[in-house]
Amino acid sequence: MKRIFISILAALVSLGALLAQEATDQNPENTKFPFAIKAYPFRGMYLDKNTHFEKFGAIYPAGVHMGFEFPSTTQRPWQQYLGNPTVGLGVSWIDFGNPTYPDVAKLGMGVAVYPYILLDAIDTKYFQMRFKIAGGPGFVTEHWYTQEDQNPDNYYEPGVNTIFGCTLNAYLNAGINLNFPITRYLALGGEFGYIHMSNGRTCMPNIGINSLYGSVGVTATLNSDVEKKPVQFPDQPYGWAINITGAAGAHKSAIADKNRFLISSFHAGAVYHVTNWYGVGLGLDVFYNDAVTKFTDRSLYCKGEYDIDGVIVDCTTCGDSKDVDYTFAQKVRSGISLNNEFKFGVVTAIVDWGMYFYNPSRHIYLDYHKDNYGKVVPKRELAYVSPWGAGSEEAFHYIRLGAKCRVWDNLYAQMTMKCHLHIAEFIEFGLGYQIPFLKKANRSEGNGIVFHHRRNWWEE
């Protein structure tokens, strides 16, 4: 893992140098471009308080965050809209903590590589406070398939690692960054934040980690004396926009399953851009989940009772109910969502919250009266509450987190994770097309009402 970390760090240094050179090439009037290098050792604590972590005893994650940062010189519209944020390329090495007892599973180490952005909250000569948002791929050394005991019956045994299900995971990080300049070139700093790492049920198990952390470190800024004259950009020329997206992926339902199940979705929505960097609107979502099937050991998708020749059979595991079949309609769900978009140039962050209006699978779940086992609970309302608590079942509402990147004109590539409460259902990848409608003040004869993104649209 140390060799991997060093290799990734070397690649990151090279990439940072190339980006700095590209920025210089795009600004020929300056032969230099400011950038910074930082290192922040950190230590944290796990928020997860469940049987998967209790067996490890008192363990704490620790490691180091490193980054290569590029302060804004206001040469692009999105930088002006967001108050000149700092962007960076980061790499983190994490020791997840190893218990002292020899018969307890090992958590191992991890490495994450990610872009990040620092949004200014306070900016003075002697102190800066910024909000950090980061996300990218993370890699771990220890998971379910690196251990000898892979028997699902031993899932909760102390010697079994159930935190990660595969090497590749999604890494998310958010926090508050504090910076105290000492000289023009050197600053001391601290950072306090939250780390999440999991695979979004691409593999099982998918417990993942959730950790708070604190860190202190140092930042060295090169070419800090370079100053550029800010460019004044016009506002975004469009207000309303229609988004149409199709996406698909695959996920695992239970550890014992030998295959993954297809998932797919379709989204159509309208967003109004309240500001140059934020839009809000409503959307229609249709989801297909092939894991609603008899070919899984996950009892979450299982008909509670079924009648065979007049005999009521109690289904406790879907793998034993081969006579039960599921229709296409039971694999489909539809919902209406509140869509939020946060624009960072060609990249847009997505935060959606939706509620199902068509959700037949809510009648499938095993959910018996505590005092009258065997009697199925009556059909649920659309807005039902699980008596077993969060995570025991899926919810009547959903959250979708992700990002889309414009690749050409109004065409974009998208990656999103769909969750029920704090439990991930799947990660999907897709393509979409945005139709932005020009504001009346920006329309001209012969150009129509639809805006088309071009590299330097503000110069036209």
Regions found by a protein language model. Give the residues of each.
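Residues that define the transmembrane beta-barrel architecture of outer-membrane proteins
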Residues: 33, 58-64, 83, 105-113, ...
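Transmembrane beta-strands of outer-membrane beta-barrel proteins
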Residues: 35-39, 85-89, 129-135, 188-190, ...
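Residues on the lipid-exposed face of transmembrane beta-strands in outer-membrane beta-barrel proteins
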Residues: 39, 64-72, 113-121, 133-137, ...
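Transmembrane beta-strands of outer-membrane beta-barrel pores
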Residues: 41-47, 70, 91-97, 135-143, ...
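Surface-exposed strand-loop-strand hairpins of Gram-negative outer-membrane beta-barrel proteins
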Residues: 45-63, 100-107, 250-269
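Repeated loop/turn-to-beta-strand initiation elements of outer-membrane beta-barrel proteins
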Residues: 75-77, 180-188, 224-227, 276-280, ...
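Extracellular/periplasm-exposed beta-strand and loop segments of Gram-negative cell-envelope proteins
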Residues: 97-107, 141-151, 157-167, 203-207, ...
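Outer-membrane beta-barrel "beta-signal"
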Residues: 210-229, 424-460
